[in-house]
Amino acid sequence: MGVKENNLVSFLVQLVLLTVLISIIELFSYLILIIAESPSEKAYKSFPEFISTKPAPFNNVDDFKEVELSYSNKASRCRGKIIYNDQIGFPRYEKDNFKCYGEELRNGVRHTTDQPSNFSRRILIFGGSTVWGSGSSDRNTIPSMIQKKINENTNKKIKVINYGFTTVTINQQLNLLKNIKIDNHDIVIFYDGGNDIFQSMINENPDGSIIGYNQSNKFNIFIQNIKFFLSNTSNTYKLMSVVKSKFNQNELQNCNNQDKEKSNALISDGFEHYISKIKQVNEYVIKNNATFIHFLQPSLFYKDNQYSDYEKKLIEISPLGINECKIYQERVMDGYKYFSNNYKNSLKDLNSNNLINTLDPVRTREEYFIDNLHVTSAGNKVITEEIYMVLKKTLN
């Protein structure tokens, strides 16, 4: 046998031994995870796994199976790639049309159910993934529920259109609005705040975009994607995550950027930027002979109402979702509080509505949030009622 053959055999033997070793470690980790698993709670959960356990917010909804599938890898492949349209300044799916596990895209926008074929007026709703409807099927998004509410309570032919999209801030919403022809008597609704606070407090750039930040930090995002992949495929990685969480006891890390003055400046500047954009939208809509209504969305980052035990646990599991530095958690919580407390006084001459305290599970005995910002259709139903109460004054 020649040198090349010997080297090949040696390489194959080492490869087999490495594969066997990895398999043994994976099996050992799997057994430890099984032993550590209690009847009520797994030792480790990825977000899709968390959804698959059917947490409390899905108790009284009719679209759980569709939502569960929407968080699967199959659904992600079905939807395809998100690209950024630099000319407009707004992201979009590479596909213009798809139908994927309860989510249907038609001509670039998510399908709103029960739309009339003939209509005399439109309601255009802009926002991030909470308007798009992450956590609900097409029929249970906020725009679809508003459409159904209008159909049931008025004899007017009004068409509701869902212009929500994941990660967008008020900057991108305004960009998109300016690229859509507004008709006389249209009603334009902006429902936002969460992504704007995140962009200002975490990415420290209120004028930027979350997708733009991701594109500028591709290496960090690549590492996060690897971690996400391992969290779904490797028992060893899951076990390491469990061990780490036991040592940290879910405490936030004290990073080296505990600059309170900087945080206060980011909060103040972020709020001023947000308010100025809302006013710009209002001026633009009025100039086009339409009506503008703004809503500050609820979140778990801050509210005046008492938190339920479920909400406390949810915050504990994932303080921010991507960054565990204590300063970032404090910024977002303080930022949301600052936005909420100063929102109404800063927009006195505008139809502005603070929905921070809309979702109150302690009072209603029903849960809504599946993470710090997103809700199930149970939450969408409550939010729809609040929006419709404001909207019907304009419709009458």
Regions found by a protein language model. Give the residues of each.
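N-terminal Sec-pathway targeting helices
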Residues: 2-21
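Histidine-centered active-site loop/cap adjacent to the catalytic His
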Residues: 11-14, 29, 274, 343-352, ...
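Conserved SGNH/GDSL esterase-like catalytic core that processes O-acyl groups on lipids
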Residues: 88-104, 122-124, 130-232, 242
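Catalytic cores of nucleotide-enabled group-transfer and carboxylate-activating enzymes in metabolic
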Residues: 146, 165, 359-363, 369, ...
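Membrane/wall-proximal cationic-aromatic binding patches
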Residues: 39-132, 136-139, 143-149, 363-364
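Membrane-interface motif at the C-terminal end of an N-terminal transmembrane signal
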Residues: 22-40
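Serine-dependent acyl-ester chemistry module
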Residues: 195-344, 363-366
